[in-house]
Design a protein with these regions (language model features):
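Mid-length scaffold segments of soluble, non-membrane domains
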Residues: 83-143, 147-150
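Short, Lys/Arg-rich N-terminal segment immediately upstream of the first membrane anchor
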Residues: 1-5
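Hydrophobic membrane-insertion alpha-helices, especially the h-region
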Residues: 8-25
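Early exported N-terminus immediately downstream of N-terminal targeting peptides
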Residues: 43-90
Length: 164
């Protein structure tokens, strides 16, 4: 039979062992989440459209450009991988710019449009039933005018917003 001191030491030892197992499990889970987040960032191409300003007209124009660009991407982007999507976008920056300019012209808006591939930081975002972790992502960015207004984004590859 164990003495009271031995029983206390045994319970303390078991408690410490469980605490260490729990800490190790939490560390391993956190590490998995970091690794998964890095994989998501590495295998994702985002579409990011930034409005001229936060005015109602600029925000409406941004959504009109979004619709035109997504329609163009639906018919033109054949990518089956992220590198293919980036290569396709790099070869079609001018066409994407023309698409955005044409959409703005339909609204009688004449403002500069800049289309570029960038690598930029995005905060954590909910997307449908999932979450995109914070991190640096490659993005096809379209700036309307100064690009200082609220933005709109989606995941271009893999095609969560369209087929690219």
């Amino acid at each position: 039979m164990l003495t009271r001191s031995q029983m206390v030491l045994l319970c303390l030892g078991l408690f410490l062992a469980l605490a260490l197992c729990g800490a190790w499990q939490a560390f391993a889970w956190g590490r998995t989440q970091l690794d998964t987040g890095a994989l998501v960032c590495a295998d994702t191409l985002r579409l990011h459209i930034r409005a001229e300003s936060d005015s109602i007209a600029s925000q409406s124009a941004k959504l009109h450009v979004r619709d035109a660009v997504l329609a163009y991407l639906d018919t033109a982007c054949p990518a089956q991988s992220k590198p293919e999507a980036i290569a396709w976008a790099a070869q079609h920056l001018f066409e994407l710019q023309l698409t955005a300019r044409h959409a703005l012209a339909q609204l009688n808006i004449r403002t500069p449009v800049r289309v570029q591939l960038v690598n930029m930081y995005f905060a954590t975002r909910r997307y449908g039933s999932g979450t995109l972790p914070a991190g640096r992502y490659d993005a096809l960015r379209i700036d309307l005018g100064a690009g200082k207004g609220r933005n709109w984004w989606c995941v271009l590859y893999p095609g969560l917003c369209r087929s690219c």
